[in-house]
Regions:
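Short, amphipathic C-terminal "tail helix"
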Residues: 178-207
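Glycine-rich ThDP/TPP pyrophosphate-binding loop and its adjacent helix/strand module
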Residues: 1-189
Length: 207
């Protein structure tokens, strides 16, 4: 919960320094109901801070459906109560998210304050290890996988628009997979932490 407030703090620091940095806080539909979000949004709005709040609404907070915990049609509707713009976008559409985020960042850098973006999407897997998602209709996930795969849609649209070729995208995929594999191998080869490391940096220490 703290990082939502930290985003407002980072935005305040950027404003005081005269930086063009914009702080971004990500949280889910469940997290959007927490007081920390309201506190951060209110402070960012009152102090006109360059902060972007992104609500990733995948329809479930652990096993609780969003319509059981959110009374309004869209989480973005709450932005009006804080005096900031709010917009709901299709989270499966890379270009829609890019456009909305770009507009919000441009607005923040122009000194016009924070924004709230609600990104509507789904999650393919459970909330935690061993979550069988018995609270969902299995066909729901199947439907999204077959019809709303954002990576597949991005590939099709960029190729159709001539922005990138299939070979360009294949090369990007290969590069990313190689970087991931390299990171995994480096992590496996690193020495294991010492028992004393468990308590390192937990408490403040003075010279």
């Amino acid at each position: 919960d703290v990082y939502k407030r930290q985003a407002a703090g980072a935005a305040l620091a950027a404003k005081l320094k005269g930086s063009d940095a914009v702080a971004v806080a990500f949280f889910g539909d469940g997290g959007s109901n927490e007081g920390a979000v309201f506190e951060a949004m209110n402070l960012a709005a009152v102090w006109n801070l360059p902060c972007l709040f992104v609500a990733e609404n995948n329809g479930y907070a652990e096993a609780t459906a969003a319509n059981w915990s959110v009374a309004c049609d869209h989480i973005a509707d709450r932005a009006a109560g804080f005096g900031m713009p709010g917009v709901t976008v299709d989270g499966f559409d890379f270009f829609a998210v890019h456009e909305a985020a770009g507009a919000a960042i441009e607005r923040a850098r122009a000194g016009e304050g924070p924004s709230l973006i609600e990104v509507k999407l789904t999650r393919y897997y459970g909330h935690f290890e061993g979550d069988a998602q018995t609270y969902r209709d299995p066909d729901e996930v199947k439907h999204y996988r077959e019809t709303r795969d954002c990576l597949k849609q991005f590939r099709e649209r960029t190729c159709h628009a001539g922005l990138l070729s299939a070979s360009d995208l294949d090369a990007i995929d290969a590069e990313v997979e190689a970087r991931i594999e390299d990171a995994v191998q480096r992590a496996k080869n690193d020495p294991k932490p010492e028992p004393d490391d468990l308590l390192r940096d937990v408490y403040v220490s003075y010279p």
